Amino acid sequence: ITCLSDINSK
């Protein structure tokens, strides 16, 4: 799954 941190990092 995609973590919130991963989305926020982009």
From Swiss-Prot:
Spans traversing the lipid bilayer: none
Chief location category: secreted
Keyword Mitochondrion: no
Family to which this protein belongs: Belongs to the thaumatin family.
Cellular compartments per GO CC: extracellular region
Alphabetized UniProt keyword annotations: Cell wall, Disulfide bond, Secreted
The UniProt record lists the keyword tRNA-binding: no
Highest taxon in the source lineage: Eukaryota
Official protein name in the record: Thaumatin-like protein 3
Compartment(s) of residence: Secreted, Cell wall
